[in-house]
Amino acid sequence: MKKENNSAHNHNRGSFSGRIGYVLAVAGSAVGLGNIWRFPYLAAKYGGGIFLLIYILLTASFGYVLIMSETALGRMTRKSPVGAFEHFGKTKSFKIGGWLNAVIPMLIVPYYSTIGGWVIKYLVEYFKGNVQAVAEDGYFGNFISDSWQAELWFLVFAALVFIIILGGVQNGVERMSKIMMPVLVVLAVVVTIYSVTRPGAVEGVKYFLIPNVKNFSWMTVVAAIGQMFYSLSIAMGILYTYGSYVRKDMDIERSTTQVEVFDTGIAILAGLMIIPAVFSFSGGNPETLQAGPSLMFITLPKVFASMGFGTATGIVFFILVLLAALTSAVSLMETSVSTFMDELHWSRKKCCGLMVVIMIVLGTASSMGYGLLDFIRIFGMNFLDFFDFMTNSVMMPLAALATCILILRVVGIDGMVKEIEQSSPFRRKKLYRVFIKYFAPICLIIILLSSIANVLGIISM
């Protein structure tokens, strides 16, 4: 009886109209703040070209295997992560792995939307022509410590995400991706061309694109693994969910390759947008390159303020960042809504309402964590930093390990190969077998242990 109900429920699931819709939706999920905000500052900090080389190698191997695995499991079961794990599990405890994948986006999307609100705030200021004001020392700190301002812009971003999700898979997620992703690419190319043609930018291009072994360290590898993990939307439940929406005749291997090429291409464009501009502004000052997360909100506004077309550049850049942030936030939200629809058997509208409540409560804690709620610290971190650490450094490696265990102990590698080959020949079958059995679990354990050691002060990342 249970199987009949599930069949009926799965029959009524949303679906993508075709491979292009799926690829653009997954690319939209992968191309976000991870590419445009996180990737450039990590590349700048960890050696430029050598970081880029390691990142590309890992994406083409480790990332490829995990994207294919999660997508295939979603298509195989026609369920979001909790249902997918339950489908194969012999006991109810097996659902823990699924819930781990499902809870991650519920925790990420609130603080992600807080940062999305910051992006809208900066975009509005550039439209007002306040290019010099946003470049002033202390502007960013004063803004995020003003709790009510930060909360207002968080709610604006959250409302945009909610409106798109309410439209469903084809009318909301797919339609948004088909419009926003091409626009994002065009804007990225425009800003990149402008950035690399600035005086002194050539040195920045060389630093970013040409690997220098002298800049290599073990932390370069750890940082590249972590970035790949974050950027490709692995272990967030997104790929399970979107996989459950695709048709059985879709070529998973080809689609995975297209997603990785698109994602890596945008990451490289982001690096070329930001690093040469910073070189041009600072003359390659190492301290400027080490700015880290503040690179986009503190360093770049100073770069734009020094340009002849700073206001126009700032507008185009922050529109680009907003589009990227929206596509990723929508993917995170859709995964959570899909989980509630599967597990609670509620309507999309009702599940959206529940997710909005979660989003506002946790998002408010994050947006006010630099102001009214700054006195609350968890392991020395405010709410936003704590949610970021727990999801990216602890829960995501564990969730991906759970997927590896599910494949190795229950589904079987042969079962995965059979599912992938339903639509087309599996060209990199041998690579898949080796990586899912040995390399992926080892890499995930390295990420987990390195992140914990970093927080404990044993190593410095």
What are these regions (language model features)?
Residues 96-102, 345-356, 388-444:
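C-terminal membrane-solvent junction of multi-pass transporters and transport-like membrane proteins
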